């Protein structure tokens, strides 16, 4: 369904979901936190446990829905329903959410990594 180099997979209930950082997700995160660079700080500084859980649930929902949105874009005749925050809350437990933090970090890393390739003929090659 999705390029696995871009995704981190989690299980919610009986379903697997790919967490993907797309441009759309980045815009949503920026709107909520002011940018990706502020995300970790905001999650760590959540005023209370309930608020921290709510932020993690929101983030999982946003990232998991990216793979569904991509699927729906490619399969307009057979779209899947988007995951809701309520579904994430009901189908997970706090231990799951702690484990998902690793997947969230992985998805964010994969979404922001840069592939740097060296040219075969370097401009700074030794001249003979």
Q: Can you name each region flagged by the protein language model?
A:
Residues 22:
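Residue-level signal for threonine
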